[in-house]
Amino acid sequence: MNKPLRNSHPLFKIANNALVDLPAPINISSWWNFGSLLGLCLIIQILTGLFLAMHYTADINLAFYSVNHICRDVNYGWLLRTLHANGASFFFICIYLHVGRGIYYGSYMFTPTWLIGVIILFLVMGTAFMGYVLPWGQMSFWGATVITNLLSAIPYLGMDLVQWLWGGFAVDNATLTRFFTFHFILPFIVLAMTMIHLLFLHQTGSNNPIGLNSNIDKIPFHPYFTFKDIVGFTVMIFILISLVLISPNLLGDPDNFIPANPLVTPAHIQPEWYFLFAYAILRSIPNKLGGVIALVLSIAILMILPFYNLSKFRGIQFYPINQVMFWSMLVTVILLTWIGARPVEEPYVLIGQILTVMYFLYYLVNPLITKWWDNLLN
């Protein structure tokens, strides 16, 4: 009997097993759309970035003006640039919702998949930070100076490490060149890591909203979830295009319209909105090294979830107190984002410190409450 080409061709077989004949749980909700949306975001970013790189010049005297040239003189350059800048925001919206879904429904119990996901998150954050430096505006330059300077908090090696990263004694041409190099290569590394992420996910199959084994009740990915994903694509692309065409600079920083000047410090140095929560955590610790450790831990703490699970049921759908705690933690992250954009003065400092403690406490207390709830129902 002749097999369809998708089942016999060595290359098509891989794609078929991942996208067409993949058995998927019948009851996965729209919260499971974000994986494919992230794939779409990555493709949009790589394509727009590729065309931007053709016209961009990684030189401190020309970078700002090359971005200006892209927006004014290159055919649809303004569209490429605004799509790329706002595409990054949508990437982070999707990635945070994707992680939040994983925490809520206990998807972190797929340990290798989860750990690779956290590594991808770190890589994407690094990529976005370096991309923000490239236009060489005021906030680009000072953001790069402040964040790279954090490495100087590392005992003994600190200053040597910072100067090695800068390629000199300050953020200069060497820094911009290497940031452009890394910003170009990292998305392809993220793409490779995504393949590994999917490889591990397909070893176990997807989780589902009730957290039970769904092997007895699965349907093929195509056509059911391909069409469901396309609905998600349509909604996201519509919102992205609307933002790009109506208010492309809404999420940017006005300071970045001023060329970088090492002699003038902006009143408020802050990163893009999607890093503000981590920036607020960094500023909440009065000690420099402590702040750096807290900054890294704000993301790295996700890695403890698979190893610190004490509940009988997967996810927190069946734990009412934990649900309240989860949504409180979400509000905490939103408030931290707000605090990150405020000046360093009272009452913002104290609020930031309280929120930081609340953020970290969630990860430590949550499993204990699930255990207590299980014991209560025994």
UniProtKB/Swiss-Prot annotation:
Keyword Mitochondrion: yes
SUPFAM superfamilies: a domain/subunit of cytochrome bc1 complex (Ubiquinol-cytochrome c reductase) (SSF81648), Transmembrane di-heme cytochromes (SSF81342)
Gene3D superfamilies, per database record: Cytochrome Bc1 Complex, Chain C
Pfam family, one: Cytochrome_B
Top-rank taxon, per record: Eukaryota
Coiled coil: none
Localization (cell): Mitochondrion inner membrane
Cofactor descriptive note: Binds 2 heme b groups non-covalently.
GO MF annotations in UniProt: metal ion binding; ubiquinol-cytochrome-c reductase activity
Function: Component of the ubiquinol-cytochrome c reductase complex (complex III or cytochrome b-c1 complex) that is part of the mitochondrial respiratory chain. The b-c1 complex mediates electron transfer from ubiquinol to cytochrome c. Contributes to the generation of a proton gradient across the mitochondrial membrane that is then used for ATP synthesis.
Record family assignment: Belongs to the cytochrome b family.
Designated name of the protein: Cytochrome b
Protein species of origin: Drosophila sechellia
Gene: mt:Cyt-b
